[in-house]
Amino acid sequence: MVTPHGILLLTITAAASLLWITFAEITIPNDAKSFENFLKEHGPGKPGPLGYFNSIYMAFTREEAENFPNLVSVHTRMKRIKTQNSTIPDKYVILGIQAPNDTQEQNSTRNKRDSESYTATTQSGTCSTTIGGLQRLCEVCPARTDLGPDITPRFINEVLCDVPGLDCGVGQVGGKCRSASVFQDFLRFSSSDSNLEVYSQEIRVCCECALALS
């Protein structure tokens, strides 16, 4: 005869076993190839503006993140990409990226998924008013962001405004310094069922002077 205590013990044991199986069946991508394969199978089917994975902007481990290039001080091998909230058609960023064929369509799809807020961002180098040999209207700073252990890739390489919202402009045309971003498909553990899910992660790639046109 099974007592109520025995039934409770069996229930807890079964639940623990199911939880173990759930985690055991999850293979967390920890390299570029497995990450790309996971996104191709479970994601929207299209690479982001930086490709599926880009080691210049993304890293799985802290050791990899420590080898991020300084996006402000690197002046060579530049290429154009579209940014999500830019008032300028193109922004210059470091080579190694893939320009999207249909940015508006991709951004519309990605914005339907929640964007993860920044967890811990630290400045990783000296700020500058020049990038790519060009004089900037806003001072830009290299930074590294740790998104936390539930996110993969965990680390991102970014470019930030030294003083967000600082006045800038040309002649009589004024503006404000603000970050421009791209959105990439990343993975995180779902809080509801402990499964990996695809979500849209913002990566700040430049600081621009947004002019107030009137």
From Swiss-Prot:
Signal peptide: 1-24
Coiled coil: none
Domain of life: Eukaryota
KW Chaperone (keyword) present: no
Residue spans of biased composition, Polar residues class: 100-109
Entry GO CC: extracellular region
Compartments, as annotated in UniProt: Secreted
Name of the featured protein: Uncharacterized skeletal organic matrix protein 8
InterPro entries in the cross-refs: Cystine-knot_cytokine
Species in which this protein is naturally found: Acropora millepora (Staghorn coral)
Cysteines paired by S-S bonds: none
Record bears the keyword Oxidoreductase: no
Tissue-wise expression: Component of the acid-insoluble and acid-soluble organic matrix of the aragonitic skeleton (at protein level).
Keyword list, A-Z: Secreted, Signal
SUPFAM superfamilies: Cystine-knot cytokines (SSF57501)
